[in-house]
């Protein structure tokens, strides 16, 4: 599957909007989000993906076609097609796994008879972005920096005959034969195997299959003579299953001849593959990373058919029809990971990660070196792991997986399983679309979070149903509490060592959803519990169960995972859970959750009484409430499922989430009408299934921002996972949007894909800047911060919200410019300081530092000349 993306800036009153629409172009059909019909659109220009070992050797290039794939071999085209109606049955959000589904398919092959076996097949007009494939656990079949091309050219298919394969916006596939002067055109002969029937109608070839009819339009042939295009009368000749060309009026053999058929998949016009939105993050350069569920039908790595003609695949909810694992992933899928430039104009890479069964990404984070870390779940025994992985073997049903990719996404730096013999990392009652126990919002089964410390050690908060889940010696809870426990663990930077791991839970269902690092490597964890005996500590806010079906919890763990420093229930007599926890720069603890009770409003001037979302701030010891408040519509029930959370440097609190009243999410309705809005809201109305963004000022004094985001009828949502705000308060939000094949979700002009080019859901990336986090500065040096004396450096002060700038270059010189040019005339290492100032901002100023190294490139000979023979003959010996 191929994901195409683009973003653009739109400057509003207090925020910038970047929107990216992620379009998969292959197969699928009915909407994952509600069965609505899309607006008319042109066909996405086809691209051809090279084979660098990720597929079987005979495939040279692959292209996604409507409801299938086209495989290009040296001497053949292989068409692999599925029935659109069958695919639509499995790609629907309301479909519970109520049994296996039969998916009808058809494969046929066009062979160029007696063609040159040594033909040179190459791609032309390559993409700037690339794809990485980590499919299965055999590194021989991993491929990095796989390019796409607009054209595949067969040089010397026959003697004097070349073949060009390409596409345009009107037709999904075109191929031209280019016949050189004096070459024999009658060499061209194609044999079509596997079709139910072949027939000529009005000089067009109809290839009848069990899932529809493919039409190759009347061939168009021409020559360029004296600079003018001269059409040549050309016809198909069909003899059994052999296809050739005839020229009733002949042609001038002294000039090249081009034969140009058009292939029209008239039966396969509407259906494309699902790419559901799960998780997003950022790096220090503002690049955006998104992860999602990529519908892997046909199964990854196994789409090469062994027989031609009609076939059936039994779809049971897992790749290859594996429906017996009881997992909570209804449809076959791999992880799809993409990186985009900070302005959204470039797709940097897309990476596929998975094995022969199901995978989903739940949380992403970028480490201090710019490498991407993925936390997710895999049901594949052959999920890709690294050579020195902590655990290279799947342990039971679904396991937690942690995978680290290089900054270019082209190689694995580490990858491991973590789990026991039952399900790990999935918070669910069986059934993808069933509410129950702690799974109260659609997508709650895919919660959990990954984060890092300054040494790039990896921390994960999740859950497990495995009594034999691996725990470390001396863990704070070494035994399984029962049914489902929360769990947390720490890996080293390359995933080769499990530094610590522990259960946390009681006798009922428990789950960890979020974590943040405290002082000196301690860990704060938050989640939900149904256990009245969940471990708590004396002196914490609430050491006993608060009531209702479930409570939230906050826990503080020591640096080696051996001691519960503080732990507290959080909730009311109703139903409560905490979905995110964050610390401010003073170490105070903040959390956001849902409630059906009357969560107390304390020391908070701003609140929306009787609302279903609460924000709590406590001291680091979890013993004192600093403030607590509620926000929402005042309906008495939760309105949104939280997806991202932040406390910025000014102690403003940011919340992102989505709600739905749609029948597409039966049992998960969160009425999001009448949410608090501000005058500068991006959108002030909702169709009932949209995203919502909320910013609360320091000490809960007031609402700073409230807005909906979405299109009318677009059914925006996420299918689980975390998105993130960066430290400046910029949201990087993954969405599942355009469901039903529509383009109703707003995008901005010039984006990579301004419309949804599928007839299904696609992952949409939103980057929204609120400009509320006070002054923030960074330093960039161009062309570089090291060099030889004299060294001239162009400094770029990347500043948010500053009005005054002060530079100290470390050599006694200063500047008040925002982007000064400075020359160093002496060698040495200089510490450059930039201070950005705005007296009216919440934090007044911010400071950044950068080291500049200036060297001397002159050479001094460290030897003496040796006098040989006489004074007229100095030689260096």
Predicted regions located by residue number:
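Bacterial Sec-dependent N-terminal signal peptides
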Residues: 1-36, 834, 842, 858, ...
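Residues that cap or anchor secondary-structure elements
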Residues: 11-14, 30-272, 279-282
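A sequence-level/structural motif corresponding to short, flexible coil/turn segments enriched
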Residues: 105-116, 170, 253-788, 801-806, ...
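Surface-exposed loops/turns
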Residues: 181, 789, 826-827, 871
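Short beta-strand segments of immunoglobulin-like
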Residues: 781-787, 864-871
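A short beta-strand segment in extracellular, disulfide-stabilized domains
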Residues: 790-799, 873-877
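Surface-exposed, flexible coil segments in extracellular/virion-facing regions
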Residues: 804-823
